């Protein structure tokens, strides 16, 4: 069965589509969304959990080396990795919040996949993290269906990373592909997330419309200018409908981080000075909340930073405030800080002022945040989001008739107002902010399922009709497969299957073969 799989920075979801009607499956406590969070007793427990309890293969040498190191570490530390050692979603968050020092916790693994400078062992670790989440989600989906899930269309941003370009995209998509294969998906395709979101919106249109899809996810913002309408709905080749697109690595997480830095970190000593009147360095406070930046988090939780923070406590005019930051370092509270800012951001969607409590750092430590403060705090990432809108429009010669705003941050009045100000004459439409990408991926998966029954072989096209219903298309080319065509007394030995990923186009499967008889 083919599913649409939104492996998101903030949340994950999956859907199936039947006769053009997508249905999202539940993943956690009856909810359609599984927050992109994972925890385990140790970092090494992830690899052992995959191997010991799910027999997930490690086909490459780096993955095998990671597994051997993990098994050795857990054995030496007397850590018993059980079937329930690895937790996901809100359960993972709850475990972390109860005892952050004793739990290895990661939020939004997807935000790291395109990072530059990752070493092979780091790539192998992220692959295991993604694989564990995908395996769990696949199992949750199969528990609601009467057949196995082995095929998926997975959403991807236009650009995973602000820097690195094609190389970063290739690295990130490679991690997703290998993780999905190891998690049991034998057949995997990718589709741009804003295109998928647009497919869901298209189902509501009754005439051809120029649509600017603005998808503000947890880790990225993607914009696509598309032609949409009834005449495009069932077309296999839609390359002509993609008029322009752009994307960058700025999303809801960046808004949360900036809000935490601007409104919460002053309670922890940001902006203070030493007893001699010298300004305290801001970098440790920034690194503490930069949870989507591997080098920043590594630097903050280093022994050298711990020594620096103790020195700052000693020298600061207000040592009690700086001691709060030292506690964040000691108890690994970065995610809780950013989570508090995220809760404030969400609350400010419906009210002008909200209160953020940092009682997990010190009793009575709290602050009020207003909508005006939110707008000021997120000004920098907001400008980058609007820049992507203008870049997408600059790549085409026409203007949109409607803006389709979606993604987890689409509900923010600040974002909506800024977008409306940038394009004052264009109406803004909304749909399912958290489910539109998944629903669109499921729609595309249903189309692919039909397309995969058509194969181009050396210029001859064999279509899946009553005469050729026995065609079995497999994408695994590790061994040579024998394919039988019912209406011809021929057997073909497949030498190679070649495909090309197209942003919004026809699935082309070209087979090199020799005739056996």
Place the predicted regions along the sequence by residue:
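Phosphate-binding glycine-rich/basic clefts of nucleotide- and phosphate-handling proteins
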Residues: 35-40, 47, 228-360
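Conserved phosphate-binding/catalytic loops in two-lobed NTP-binding clefts
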Residues: 183-191, 417-443
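Cationic, low-complexity basic patches in intrinsically disordered or flexible, solvent-exposed regions
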Residues: 481, 501-503, 507
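Nucleotide/phosphate-binding catalytic cleft detector across ATP-hydrolyzing
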Residues: 1-22, 96-213, 234, 321-340, ...
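Extended, hydrophobic alpha-helical segments in both membrane/secreted and soluble proteins
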Residues: 176, 209-224, 405-408, 415, ...
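Early-domain small/polar-rich strand-loop-helix modules and first-structured segments
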Residues: 1-118, 251-281, 286-289
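A short acidic Gly-Thr/Ser loop motif
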Residues: 5-11, 157, 213-222, 226, ...
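N-terminal amphipathic/hydrophobic targeting modules at extreme N-termini
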Residues: 453-464, 474, 478, 496-499
């Amino acid at each position: 069965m083919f599913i649409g799989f939104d492996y998101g920075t903030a949340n994950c979801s999956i859907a199936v589509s039947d006769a053009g009607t997508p249905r999202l499956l539940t993943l956690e406590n009856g909810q359609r969304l599984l927050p992109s969070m994972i925890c385990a007793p140790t970092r090494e427990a992830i690899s052992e959990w995959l191997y010991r309890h799910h027999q997930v293969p490690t086909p490459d040498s780096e993955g095998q080396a990671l597994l051997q190191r993990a098994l050795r570490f857990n054995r030496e530390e007397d850590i018993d990795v059980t079937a329930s050692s690895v937790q996901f979603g809100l359960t993972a968050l709850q475990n972390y919040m109860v005892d952050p020092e004793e739990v290895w916790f990661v939020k939004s693994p997807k935000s790291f996949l395109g990072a530059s400078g990752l070493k092979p062992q780091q790539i192998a670790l992220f692959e295991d993290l993604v694989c564990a989440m995908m395996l769990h989600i696949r199992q949750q989906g199969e528990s609601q269906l009467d057949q196995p899930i082995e095929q998926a269309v997975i959403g991807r941003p236009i650009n995973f990373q602000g820097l690195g370009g094609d190389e970063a995209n290739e690295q990130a998509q490679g991690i997703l592909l290998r993780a999905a294969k190891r998690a049991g998906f034998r057949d995997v395709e990718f589709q741009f997330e804003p295109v998928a979101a647009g497919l869901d919106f298209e189902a509501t249109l009754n005439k051809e419309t120029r649509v600017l899809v603005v998808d503000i996810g947890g880790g990225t913002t993607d914009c696509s200018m598309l032609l949409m309408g009834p005449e495009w709905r069932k077309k296999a080749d839609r390359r002509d409908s993609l008029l322009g697109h752009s994307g960058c690595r700025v999303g809801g997480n960046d808004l949360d981080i900036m809000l935490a830095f601007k409104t919460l970190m002053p309670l922890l000593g940001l902006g203070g000075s030493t007893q001699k009147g010298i300004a305290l360095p801001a970098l440790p406070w920034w690194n503490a909340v930069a949870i989507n930046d591997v080098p920043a988090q590594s630097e903050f939780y280093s022994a050298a930073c711990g020594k620096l923070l103790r020195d700052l406590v000693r020298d600061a005019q207000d040592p009690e405030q700086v001691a709060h930051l030292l506690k964040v370092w000691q108890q690994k509270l970065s995610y809780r800080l950013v989570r508090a800012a995220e809760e404030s951001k969400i609350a400010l969607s419906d009210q002008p002022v909200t209160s953020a409590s940092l009682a997990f750092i010190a009793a009575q430590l709290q602050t009020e945040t207003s909508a005006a403060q939110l707008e000021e705090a997120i000004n920098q990432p907001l400008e980058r989001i609007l820049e992507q809108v203008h870049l997408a429009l600059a790549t085409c010669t026409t203007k949109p008739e409607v803006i389709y705003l979606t993604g987890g941050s689409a509900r923010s009045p600040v974002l909506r107002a800024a977008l409306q100000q940038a394009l004052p004459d264009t109406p803004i439409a909304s749909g399912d902010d958290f489910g539109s990408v998944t629903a669109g991926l499921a729609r595309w998966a249903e189309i692919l399922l039909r397309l995969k029954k058509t194969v181009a072989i050396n210029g001859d096209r064999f279509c899946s009709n009553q005469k050729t219903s026995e065609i079995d298309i497999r994408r695994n080319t590790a061994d040579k497969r024998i394919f039988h065509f019912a209406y011809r007394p021929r057997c073909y030995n497949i030498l190679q299957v070649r495909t090309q990923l197209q942003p919004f186009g026809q699935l082309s499967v070209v087979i090199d073969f020799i005739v056996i008889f």
